[in-house]
Amino acid sequence: MASASRTENAPVIADEALVNAIVEPEKRLGVDRYFTIPGRDPFAEIEWEIRDAFIPGKDKPVFEQKGVEFPKFWSQTATNIVAQKYFRGRMNSPERESSVKQMIGRVVDTIAGWGRDGGYFADEEEAETFAAELKAILVNQLASFNSPV
């Protein structure tokens, strides 16, 4: 069995030195725009449509949500999965999400908020860049989450 041991010459880092270490300028993310243009909402760059999400079952639907808003280029399979697994809120309640805009907005706002709170961004402009880029990546299906968020 392998074991790790401390090397005599290895530096010891006090716990105090680790607190807020991420706010050091050289440790910031340094986010640049690649998929977005300043002042333009990534959601406004694509065509949207209202459709129904439906997963059939043997005798009745396993899942159904009518009137959901999705990018026009997303498949019906993506619509069904996202509406069933990723939209938050009880079905037929006012809190129930009904648009990819709501779902991605919720996720992006949460992650960008964590970045702001953790000092990952140099300034608010960088935080807004990060949020816009993540929104564009997700809505254009360049990346997705592995589990419901």
Where are these predicted regions, by residue range?
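Extended catalytic cores of very large enzyme megasubunits
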Residues: 1-149
